[in-house]
């Protein structure tokens, strides 16, 4: 298997809770806590913040440098394009993706997503049974490329529909032990 990278999608443009990614818990930014959790994994070749070219996101690049991880700057609104270009830039074959405001994600599930990919070769692997704030996705670079070719919008902040509504991708939601599942 080629390189596996964790792409953290992050921007500073939140309006409901401004600058939420740099709010501190115990003197550490929320995004730094997430990075710490990702560093606990043995399966990742890269951890990358995928942010925008907007100057307000400079602080995220500074945090990436301080935390000794990489960053990529791309489109502000086209999240799929940003993910694809970041993965291509760092020569990733497989991507684990999470939004930066999910600092409590469990590294146990990183391994589960990758194991499922190795078994199923699914284009997208989801963890929808986990509580909100713990979701992560597994994506093949080749599937991202296909979405770039077929998408009809440049605002792809919500991009899952390209995988689930087109009927051209193999999508798998992994089994989550009952004790970790959310109650709807």
Ranges and model annotations:
Residues 53-116:
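Short phosphate-binding loop-to-helix
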């Amino acid at each position: 298997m080629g390189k596996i990278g964790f792409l953290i999608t992050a921007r500073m443009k939140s309006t409901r809770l401004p600058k939420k990614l740099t709010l501190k818990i115990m003197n550490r930014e929320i995004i730094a806590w997430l990075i710490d959790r990702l560093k606990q994994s043995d399966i990742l070749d890269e951890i990358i913040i995928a942010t925008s070219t907007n100057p307000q996101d400079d602080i995220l690049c500074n945090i990436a440098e301080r935390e000794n991880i990489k960053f990529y700057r791309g489109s502000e609104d086209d999240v799929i394009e940003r993910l694809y270009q970041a993965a291509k830039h760092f020569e990733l074959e497989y991507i684990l993706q999470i939004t930066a405001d999910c600092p409590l994600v469990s590294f146990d599930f990183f391994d589960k997503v990758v194991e499922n990919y190795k078994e199923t070769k699914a284009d997208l692997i989801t963890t929808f049974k986990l509580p909100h704030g713990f979701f992560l996705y597994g994506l093949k670079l080749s599937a991202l490329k296909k979405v770039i070719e077929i998408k009809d919008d440049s605002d792809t902040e919500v991009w899952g529909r390209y995988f689930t509504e087109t009927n051209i991708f193999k999508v798998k939601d992994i089994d989550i032990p009952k004790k970790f599942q959310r109650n709807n």
